Amino acid sequence: MGIFSIANQHIRFAVKLATAIVLALFVGFHFQLETPRWAVLTAAIVAAGPAFAAGGEPYSGAIRYRGFLRIIGTFIGCIAGLVIIIAMIRAPLLMILVCCIWAGFCTWISSLVRIENSYAWGLAGYTALIIVITIQPEPLLTPQFAVERCSEIVIGIVCAIIADLLFSPRSIKQEVDRELESLLVAQYQLMQLCIKHGDGEVVDKAWGDLVRRTTGLQGMRSNLNMESSRWARANRRLKAINTLSLTLITQSCETYLIQNTRPELITDTFREFFDTPVETAQDVHKQLKRLRRVIAWTGERETPVTIYSWVAAATRYQLLKRGVISNTKINATEEEILQGEPEVKVESAERHHAMVNFWRTTLSCILGTLFWLWTGWTSGSGAMVMIAVVTSLAMRLPNPRMVAIDFIYGTLAALPLGLLYFLVIIPNTQQSMLLLCISLAVLGFFLGIEVQQRLLGSMGALASTINIIVLDNPMTFHFSQFLDSALGQIVGCVLAFTVILLVRDKSRDRTGRVLLNQFVSAAVSAMTTNVARRKENHLPALYQQLFLLMNKFPGDLPKFRLALTMIIAHQRLRDAPIPVNEDLSAFHRQMRRTADHVISARSDDKRRRYFGQLLEELEIYQEKLRIWQAPPQVTEPVHRLAGMLHKYQHALTDS
């Protein structure tokens, strides 16, 4: 598809974006707002942002949720800006520097929270900076400006939501239903591959794809939850299905690993059974019914524990899947499944990455301040705002450099486009609200097409063009002011890009090591006799960390296999019948403390020392298990875990 071609599926959102812009423009001028531009800009960003992220029309609820986050971020930023101004109005330079630190602090938080919620914190950072910079000539008008800014933003968000509702947004429910069916078939096919014990690379690709698809289904659940409250029951079921899908992956991969040392555990009965190919969810349903009969006939003791656990999880998955598709009332059997174990939240492994983002944002804002004060340029304030916007938004994403380039391309494209509107279109349409609305609707329509195609610079061009054309009340046309604003945007983006290049992010290897050590800590923490601790559900958190590892190190199969082995060890030890006595309980606590020291160690020497101590404690623990006559279900997983840690100790301790 060419850059300027229009696909049918893109037209509806383009009309939706144009409608949001026109509504915000009309309401802004109708209520005599001082700067309707902010309402129009907000409507455009709230509507276009999810479309750019999705690469097409966003699903129902995405625009509303983004608008909600923007309101929260704006209010937090306005309150922070007011507090900073009240406390430091007598020291303007210090006030701006504190604002720069506040922007960095918000970026630091946004790097640690969930990616969906990070938008609010990024917005809070640069909103405070915008307020502080804008009120420099008249600081006594700060409360009035903050109220006006909040009002204009709320109007823009409401207009974007109304436009979204007018053009019947897509529901994600049908996609969820199809993915649930397809995912079950893929889970069965993974188990077939693992029982055949064929090529390891094929198995690695299969389980890696399933981890990504399960994570994608979790994202769909979030969208469905945002869409409407009527999907509350489906949302509860999908949350449990996430854990069940991860359990199926874990049991399949453990079946494969067991055959490396004890292939006789998988009998010919099960090998022949899983030879039957499946194509649809109905085929899987028939096979599961037959498999349950086989297990009932052979007995639980004669069935490998991984296959028995896999069938139990697949049966629960199937039951909840039917409930999601029909969205019927939750019955007693489903309620028992949904009342499962509480999920555990783990500490972020990206703290060093978050600190790099803090310094990038803070230093770029301070650099912008120095540039503004040194040059005395009237649009230095505009450059500072763009610096804060680019760094706050770029830092949340996997590739900040490309986001900064997108903004540079967008601001460059906005210069001729804004020039056309400033010199020709708006002066000739300002006497007619209808013509003015049509002219901006055309801009929104065509940029809406390009935003959905993720054309480099399209999102930046949309925001930058609206920002520099005259949409104030009353309209004034000063060419020097327009040129200053346009050049200020470009200079701000270039300065932000320069700081991103200079402050290098070398946290990738450290993050990978912390993630692997967190897997080790989780496996060690599973060795416990505490009933409450054994009931905790670590699986979603562990696979979330594995997904992050896969994104940080694409194609690094040894790391993925090591992480998956730790997850399998955690699940097996969690269910192992460890003898209950005070001696073992005290030693469990000691090993957990040592594992925590491995994660928190700041130097390689300390980390190696604590890791060596952990290996010694595992040897002592195995001896204690023999003394207390622990069954093979306990001793074998512990022995495998100790062997893995010995084998990979350099990868787990060296920077």
Swiss-Prot record:
Alphabetized Pfam families for the sequence: FUSC
Membrane topology classification: Multi-pass membrane protein
Molecular function in Gene Ontology: transmembrane transporter activity
Example GO biological process: carboxylic acid transport
A GO cellular component entry from the record: plasma membrane
Compartment(s): Cell inner membrane
Keyword Membrane: yes
Bilayer-spanning residue ranges: 13-33, 38-58, 69-89, 93-113, 121-141, 152-172, 370-390, 407-427, 431-451, 455-475, 482-502
Record keywords, A-Z: Cell inner membrane, Cell membrane, Membrane, Transmembrane, Transmembrane helix, Transport
InterPro entries: PHBA_efflux_AaeB/fusaric-R (IPR006726), PHBA_efflux_pump_AaeB (IPR023706)
Disulfide bridge map: none
Entry similarity comment: Belongs to the aromatic acid exporter ArAE (TC 2.A.85) family.
Function: Forms an efflux pump with AaeA. Could function as a metabolic relief valve, allowing to eliminate certain compounds when they accumulate to high levels in the cell.
NCBIfam families: PRK10631.1
Entry protein name: p-hydroxybenzoic acid efflux pump subunit AaeB
Species for this entry: Shigella boydii serotype 4 (strain Sb227)
